[in-house]
Amino acid sequence: MLARLVPGLQVSAYDYIQASRLRARFTREFITGVFSRVDVLVAPTIPEPAPSLAEAKSGTVDDVVRRMGRFSRLTRTISTFGLPALSVACGFSTRGLPIGIQLIGRPFDEATILRLGHAYERVTAWHTRRPPL
């Protein structure tokens, strides 16, 4: 894990500030491009079905880190942009494991995604089902 953090020490203050400015520009462009047309963006929470618990724990530490990186790639971007998001259950995979969708809102508009998530759960029953253990 330390080996993955050490390269960050090589980033200069100038490069860090430039990257922060670039992130701010991408964030503005994303927000303007998406939220000028919709109130909420709906996307998968993770890009592939969840593994079994045994599969999730298998492999080396690097394997687990890579797996978590794959799973978080759709939520990580939204977090980087600082947007509010809520994941709600929307079904089960063919293996019987839960699948989620994320509701993504405008900056500081948590109320809208919470209302939408609540409304979704009132008309579906996915949040009441549990996978077999």
Segment roles from a protein language model:
Residues F26-R37:
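Short amphipathic alpha-helices and their capping/turn segments at secondary-structure boundaries
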